[in-house]
Amino acid sequence: MTEPRYWDDYEVGQKFPLGSTTFTEQEIVDFARQFDPQPFHIDAEAAKQSMYGGIIASGWHVASKMMRLFVDNYVDRRTALGSPGLDELRWLKPVRGGDTLTGTVICAA
């Protein structure tokens, strides 16, 4: 186990790798059925006719999986202080079954 991290231990520009996560079409559909049941997330035929041309992950599913990487690979449970929130969250490109995303935390301020 590494040493606990406190606010004073961080330096601007520090990078912390979070690892990777791969999405499957089934988990995309399962998540969306429960939390974001829009046709392009849950219905293959409707999704084909959409601007995306197929099933895509809910942005909230993507955010949730990235949060899991963050907690598993970055948060020190001994010194966790909660989160002050997010300043910006954007989904720039659709995520599909088979896609793998990799996260990195960069200390900005």
Where are these regions (language model features)?
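Hot-dog-fold acyl-thioester-processing enzymes
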Residues: M1-G85
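Hydrophobic beta-sheet segments that form the core/acyl-binding groove
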Residues: G85-A109
